[in-house]
Amino acid sequence: MINLSKRLQTIADFVTPGSRICDVGCDHAYLDIRLLQQETIPSALAMDVAPGPLSIAQQNLMLTGLLGRCETRLSDGLAGYKKGEAGTLVIAGMGGRLMASILSADPDKTESFRELILSPQSEPWLVRGCLSLSGIGITDEKCVEEDGKYYCVMKAVPGAPCIRPDWGAVLQRIDEMSDEELSQAGVERGSIRRILSSEPFRAGVEAEYGPCLIKNADPCLKKQLLGALKSRISVYNKLCEQTDPGVAAKTRMQVLRGEIGRMQALTFALCYAI
């Protein structure tokens, strides 16, 4: 049986058993092969825009004796897909901008799937924004660390509400904390309440980091956030050491202050209030 990377295995775990998948950007069809070998799915449609990867996918399917259960198709995004051919759409291994363009190119096709399993390599906020505009709710999400990088894997369902953090409960938890507890956490009650009560803050962090990941206080997200926060503070401190910073440096410092403040507030919420 073929072995999957941690990220691909997380994607596989999100697929509803018995659902035929349409794997866009299938690369070598490893995901399709594993799901078929496990009998998780009855059949699959593997599509890729490049002939090379599709040819390798066909070879892998032949070697595993699964070519009859997985159709391969040359397609730019969902251009070669017909509505109703699959219940689950899987897109992974590409940037968020390209993924969002595929999802928005033909809304009828995108919304015809019962579920979407998506794992952008970058700019996940663009994918989350695209889903929100299309009325496709994120119902589950995992953060995966692989080879020193962090990836999100999200499950979304057309017409379903997006699972979001209970910010009201977060504020209630802050109200229940003593001044000593808040001091040990490095925050001031009024200040942290104002930040976490802000709708722009909530919308921003949910888009950037994932509403489900925040709601579940995902341990991998915490690790990712702490690493990113440390990196930004380091850059900010180096800029502060400049004796005569120019306009570009001052602008960068202002941006970093905002980013660091938001990240610190979210880190507090994840570690103490969610």
Q: Where do the PLM segments sit?
A:
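S-adenosyl-L-methionine
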Residues: M1-R20, I33, P51, S55-G84
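Class I S-adenosyl-L-methionine
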Residues: I2-L4, A100-I274
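Conserved S-adenosyl-L-methionine
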Residues: V24-G25
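Conserved SAM-binding loop of SAM-dependent methyltransferases across substrates and taxa
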Residues: H28-I41
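Short helix-capping segments at alpha-helix termini
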Residues: E39-T40, M62-L67, D108-E111
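Conserved SAM-binding motif I beta-strand of class I
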Residues: S43-D48
